[in-house]
Amino acid sequence: MTHQTHSYHMVNPSPWPLTGALSALLMTSGLIMWFHFNSMLLLTLGLSTNILTMYQWWRDIIRESTFQGHHTPTVQKGLRYGMILFIVSEVLFFTGFFWAFYHSSLAPTPELGGCWPPTGIRPLNPLEVPLLNTSVLLASGVSITWAHHSLMEGNRKHMLQALFITIALGLYFTLLQASEYYEAPFTISDGIYGSTFFVATGFHGLHVIIGSTFLIVCFLRQVKFHFTSNHHFGFERAAWYWHFVDVVWLFLYVSIYWWGS
């Protein structure tokens, strides 16, 4: 093995990007199969492959960063820019959903009855479950900031407590969203209103699940003393992602639940 004289991480070839891409293909194809043919076989296979990929990819990253010391300040700087670009791409992703919503709602076509919400659609009350969901996510934003400050101050106990509260609030939000979907008086097939509502809020819900998974991994890593007050890159990126999810929900609440109703 040659001696490394630079601060960059020369990553070994990894199969996980390929298996991750294949699992994404299986999940999206499986979602179509579930919607149109009521078969969850492909979707279950895709989810299983995705969970296995996440586990093994996280295992490799933890080994490289925590135990082998490959995440030098130079590498962290590059990863930080990468995370910023990823969040920007997610902003553009949700911009498409908001564009579809406002395009349809600001000038409703005669087929919709010339009004918004369309004739026959009974929208959800924004002051009931959606307002509770807003409170839950805002509280989780406060608790993850508490966790971050506790970690920087070296207070491990408070960091674990705050992170546990954040995870619990994230899971509670997901349960509330699932119950709202179950009790909604309209479906995804109820025209443009149902489509924009369920796709926009559903993709946000998916991001909450991804963020919660990220935070659970950070919690387990903190239990095993992987983070220090100076080196906690993984947790910091998870906190960024969680704040992004918070902000997107505020736009969803104001646009779709409050103004759109």
Swiss-Prot record:
Keywords: Membrane, Mitochondrion, Mitochondrion inner membrane, Translocase, Transmembrane, Transmembrane helix. It catalyses: 4 Fe(II)-[cytochrome c] + O2 + 8 H(+)(in) = 4 Fe(III)-[cytochrome c] + 2 H2O + 4 H(+)(out). GO terms for cellular component: mitochondrial inner membrane; respiratory chain complex IV. Its EC number is 7.1.1.9. InterPro entries: Cyt_c/ubiquinol_Oxase_su3, Cyt_c_oxase_su3_dom, Cyt_c_oxidase-like_su3, Cyt_c_oxidase_su3-like_sf, Cyt_c_oxidase_su3_a-hlx. It comes from the Eukaryota. One of its GO terms (biological process) is mitochondrial electron transport, cytochrome c to oxygen. Residues 1-15, 67-72, 153-155, 224-232 are mitochondrial matrix. Component of the cytochrome c oxidase (complex IV, CIV), a multisubunit enzyme composed of 14 subunits. The complex is composed of a catalytic core of 3 subunits MT-CO1, MT-CO2 and MT-CO3, encoded in the mitochondrial DNA, and 11 supernumerary subunits COX4I, COX5A, COX5B, COX6A, COX6B, COX6C, COX7A, COX7B, COX7C, COX8 and NDUFA4, which are encoded in the nuclear genome. The keyword Ribosomal protein does not apply. Residues 35-40, 106-128, 184-190, 257-261 are mitochondrial intermembrane. Component of the cytochrome c oxidase, the last enzyme in the mitochondrial electron transport chain which drives oxidative phosphorylation. The respiratory chain contains 3 multisubunit complexes succinate dehydrogenase (complex II, CII), ubiquinol-cytochrome c oxidoreductase (cytochrome b-c1 complex, complex III, CIII) and cytochrome c oxidase (complex IV, CIV), that cooperate to transfer electrons derived from NADH and succinate to molecular oxygen, creating an electrochemical gradient over the inner membrane that drives transmembrane transport and the ATP synthase. Coiled coil: none annotated. This is Cytochrome c oxidase subunit 3. Belongs to the cytochrome c oxidase subunit 3 family. It is a multi-pass membrane protein. One of its GO terms (molecular function) is cytochrome-c oxidase activity. It is found in: Mitochondrion inner membrane. The chain crosses the membrane at residues 16-34, 41-66, 73-105, 129-152, 156-183, 191-223, 233-256.
